[in-house]
Amino acid sequence: MTPTLISAFLTYTLITALTPGPNNILALSSVTSHGLRRSLRVLAGMSVGFIITMLICAALTFSLVELDSRFTLVLGWIGAAYILWLAWQIAKSKPATGTPSVEPVGFWASLGLQFVNVKIILYGITALSTFVLPVTREPVWLISVSLLLAAIGALGNLCWALAGHLFQRLFLLYGRQLNWMLAALLVYCAVRIVVE
């Protein structure tokens, strides 16, 4: 993997992990409403579910590419298109707000959320098909990168959880500017994918 591709990979994964999504909003909302200690099982469920989902994404993406190597190119273009769509959605979105719930979500509910969380499924498929499979098809690399993707995603959830009210206030104050900056960085990622 070239330094340019690594920088695009890290930019994509960090932005995707830190931008608003079901997990991040749930983490923010749970900690804001119930405190960090009572929200640990929510964060644990998300993390375990994230690992399982990333491994499933790796198996699915690898299978498609093994079926026909042209899928790498197709998935790369689809990944670039998805990143551009994500950039547009972020650029036009309003700042995030967390809606508190009555009781904190449990471990199993937050784990189950991962299997219907389109954002992380596309995150895994896009990262693997765009940044890993064009370079190597070694199972150890696919598994390692899947675990790295899950760790980066869990780190994003933890950042939102720890930031709590402070992060929410910052999004309310500077959300538009932040969204435009993140969108521009995602456009950079998409361009690097197509150029690489």
Swiss-Prot record:
<feature type="topological domain" description="Periplasmic">
    <location>
        <begin position="192"/>
        <end position="196"/>
    </location>
</feature>
<feature type="transmembrane region" description="Helical">
    <location>
        <begin position="42"/>
        <end position="62"/>
    </location>
</feature>
<feature type="transmembrane region" description="Helical">
    <location>
        <begin position="171"/>
        <end position="191"/>
    </location>
</feature>
<keyword id="KW-0029">Amino-acid transport</keyword>
<keyword id="KW-1003">Cell membrane</keyword>
<comment type="function">
    <text>Exporter of O-acetylserine (OAS) and cysteine.</text>
</comment>
<feature type="transmembrane region" description="Helical">
    <location>
        <begin position="1"/>
        <end position="21"/>
    </location>
</feature>
<feature type="transmembrane region" description="Helical">
    <location>
        <begin position="115"/>
        <end position="135"/>
    </location>
</feature>
<dbReference type="GO" id="GO:0005886">
    <property type="term" value="C:plasma membrane"/>
</dbReference>
<dbReference type="InterPro" id="IPR001123">
    <property type="entry name" value="LeuE-type"/>
</dbReference>
<keyword id="KW-0813">Transport</keyword>
<feature type="topological domain" description="Periplasmic">
    <location>
        <begin position="63"/>
        <end position="70"/>
    </location>
</feature>
<feature type="transmembrane region" description="Helical">
    <location>
        <begin position="140"/>
        <end position="160"/>
    </location>
</feature>
<feature type="topological domain" description="Periplasmic">
    <location>
        <begin position="136"/>
        <end position="139"/>
    </location>
</feature>
<keyword id="KW-0997">Cell inner membrane</keyword>
<comment type="similarity">
    <text>Belongs to the Rht family.</text>
</comment>
<keyword id="KW-1133">Transmembrane helix</keyword>
<dbReference type="GO" id="GO:0015171">
    <property type="term" value="F:amino acid transmembrane transporter activity"/>
</dbReference>
<feature type="transmembrane region" description="Helical">
    <location>
        <begin position="71"/>
        <end position="91"/>
    </location>
</feature>
<feature type="topological domain" description="Cytoplasmic">
    <location>
        <begin position="161"/>
        <end position="170"/>
    </location>
</feature>
<protein>
    <recommendedName>
        <fullName>Cysteine/O-acetylserine efflux protein</fullName>
    </recommendedName>
</protein>
<feature type="topological domain" description="Cytoplasmic">
    <location>
        <begin position="22"/>
        <end position="41"/>
    </location>
</feature>
<keyword id="KW-0812">Transmembrane</keyword>
<feature type="topological domain" description="Cytoplasmic">
    <location>
        <begin position="92"/>
        <end position="114"/>
    </location>
</feature>
<keyword id="KW-0472">Membrane</keyword>
<dbReference type="GO" id="GO:0033228">
    <property type="term" value="P:cysteine export across plasma membrane"/>
</dbReference>
<dbReference type="Pfam" id="PF01810">
    <property type="entry name" value="LysE"/>
</dbReference>
